[in-house]
A protein has these predicted regions:
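One-carbon transfer enzymes
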Residues: 1-129
């Protein structure tokens, strides 16, 4: 366990939706953590006019000057993200990609995946519906 006088834990956050943004906000405002970057989905077309719209996590990160990165399930991009952010902790919530083992095992304090249902019984993108 870290002493409170130590530097904050360098944290990489992976997420997309509003719910994950709530946890990102809590971590961002907790002095024990420093969000070094976020990985989220690319902007997606939304609505009848198909307007490119950022994820809620990207919106939060942009508003708070946190670097945003996209991997698109590309193994090399996951390797680049580890070099770029050098996380001590990875927190993943509502992120629609299967993460490579090397990525999950990299951080000093490992990785945390929060899922809003019992796995594997209620797996998938909308497990609580």
């Amino acid at each position: 366990m870290r002493n409170l006088k130590e530097e904050p834990i360098q944290t990489l956050f992976l997420g997309t939706d509003w719910e994950s943004t709530q946890i990102l906000n809590a971590l961002y405002n907790d002095k024990r953590f420093k969000i070094t970057g976020v990985i989220t989905n690319e902007d997606k077309p939304v609505g009848r006019k198909q307007v490119l719209t950022p994820s809620k996590v990207k919106e939060f990160a942009t508003e708070n000057n946190i670097e945003v990165y996209h991997t698109n399930s590309d193994t090399e991009k996951y390797k680049e993200a580890l070099k770029r952010f050098n996380p001590e902790l990875i927190v993943c919530i509502a992120f629609g990609e299967i993460l490579p083992d090397f990525f999950i095992e990299y951080p000093k304090y490992k990785s945390i995946n929060i899922h809003f249902s019992i796995l594997p019984k209620y797996r998938g993108a909308v497990p609580v519906q």
